[in-house]
Amino acid sequence: MRFDECNFVTEMDEYCRQEFLKRIRDYDDSIAPTMRQNGYKRVDATERTVLFTFGEITFSRNRWRRGQKTLYPVDEWLGLEKYMRYSPELIFHMAKHASKLSYREVCRTICDAYRIGVTKDAVLKATKVVGQLLEEKERYRFYLEEEQPPQRIKASKIYLEGDGVMVKTTSSGNERSNTDLTHFLVHTGVKQVTKDRWILKNKHEIVHVNHEKAKEELLDYLYNHFEITDQTILITNSDNGKGYTKRTFQEIKKALGIKRHEHFWDEYHLNQKIKTFFKPYPEMLYNLAQKAIQTHKKPLLITVLDTVESLIETKEQYETYFSFRQKMIRNFKDTKPAKLRNLSHKGLGVMESQHRKITYRMKHRGMYWSIKGACTMAKMILLERIDQLEQLFFGDWRKSYQPYQNQRFSAGRANKKIKEPPKIRRYRSGHKTGRWLTHVK
């Protein structure tokens, strides 16, 4: 008779259930003397049904009372709060799957892999838990009595790229619109891991629905994680779109106190722009324009553009030409190739590939997000890709945060709680100039 794997899995599931129930009984018995010693009296035993990663379990646990206070030691041991239907581990698993799959696909995956049924609303609630944890972790920073500053990265070059990711969102009035997610990427170069594979060193990504907050978070990270010296070079790359121009990165350079800054007009976007513009004109002009860029000869580019102007026949063509000419001449310095700046091109222009993990999950397929939900999902995707989502759920910071969890956060209360100011710099935008002002607290 052939081995029945399905039947074996069913038997193992039942064995796990019985073993779990036994451990609950053992824990209840072991904690009883401690509860009595602390003045609690056992009232009764009540049942509860919870979905775990190993199945749906109905179990009975003791209820203890001291005065008006009631405790369920088993619930605390399992990390279960009042009315909690899903275990913390299962919530984490749902959130992890949701960073890669649609909510309905997560339900199917959980059903196939875990042999339990969850709803798409449960998956949605799991992502909301992530949003809440992200807020708590950010809030927790201001309650620290003592903080060990992170070990600063010593790097001669800091690479920084920025771009936006457009996603479809809905407002409270069910109005649909497009929202731009701000995405910044920081790294210190590339490292070869196999013959044909390279990875970014010290990679860190920041994403937010608010452009200003993303920039503040970026500066906060750079100040606290990098050792800036007179030899540090800030190498930036972008498509020069709104919010990601050279001026934006120059403000960062000034705030960091970096002396040398090299900004690149992203090669992919630049080539696409040139190719699109020269499509109606002779191919020779396109080749000469590319040569002007590769050799960084501005007079040659101006000659090519003057030749194009002589071929213009309509007003629409002239408007397109004038806009293109202005942008090319104004930003020509940013088109200088890396090799002519004595820099390596490796590690430049990687933002589009870093976008994919977000766009594959959040764009197309008719998906719409709330503003808050879009921000949470994008951050969740980034955490999952660097294996930090589990730390958000079960890291030591959560235990340290518990004493402050129910306290209202304010500057005055924070000052009372913090004996010594944490060695963290915080930033805000200048009211008139729009430039960042640093505040060490």
Pin down the residues of each PLM region.
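Catalytic center-proximal scaffold of phosphoryl-transfer enzymes
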Residues: 1-21, 64-441
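N-terminal juxtadomain amphipathic helix
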Residues: 28-61
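N-terminal "assembly arms/tails" that initiate or stabilize quaternary assembly
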Residues: 14-34
